[in-house]
Amino acid sequence: MYTGSHSISMDPKGRMAIPTRIRDALVESCGGRLVVTAHTEDRCLLVYPEHEWLALLPQIEALPSFNKVSQRVKRILIGYATPLEIDGNGRVLVPPTLRDYANLDKKIMLVGQGKKLELWSEESWLALLNAPAEDEIPGEMLSLSL
């Protein structure tokens, strides 16, 4: 389970060091093999351990092809999906197309989301946290006790 928010740096080549706790968990669960893709609604990236992505992929592929929203989701998730591997220095290289999609620069945030991680530009992450709530709490969340 991946939790926590980590402020990290990305070098000009697009390499970022994975924080030790997260890196160790990723190496243990998937040998450091990841799949990174674009989020369908926010300008951030989704980082999956390879086995989690492979389990999710059939569900994505099964989305109806004649539904425009489903087709858009499939195009983004599968079209941007890129396999990555943690190198010997504990870093991954994020390709330029994905960096551009999420507006990633030097300062980035790696945010745990349970079975996956999200990768945000620090500026976008802080804007999200500071944005006023736009919607009411969905009914299915009302029973959640924090």
Swiss-Prot record:
Signal peptide span: none
Stretches assigned to the SpoVT-AbrB domain: 5-52, 81-124
A biological-process GO annotation: negative regulation of DNA-templated transcription initiation
MF terms (GO), sorted A to Z: DNA-binding transcription factor activity; transcription cis-regulatory region binding
Keyword Acyltransferase listed: no
Places the protein is found: Cytoplasm, Nucleoid
Assigned GO CC terms: cytoplasm; nucleoid
Broad class of the protein's primary localization: cytoplasm
One Pfam family recorded for the sequence: MraZ
Keywords tagged on the record: Cytoplasm, DNA-binding, Repeat, Transcription, Transcription regulation
Repeat keyword on record: yes
NCBIfam families listed in its UniProt record: division/cell wall cluster transcriptional repressor MraZ
Family stated for the protein in its record: Belongs to the MraZ family.
Subunit structure: Forms oligomers.
Protein name per Swiss-Prot or TrEMBL: Transcriptional regulator MraZ
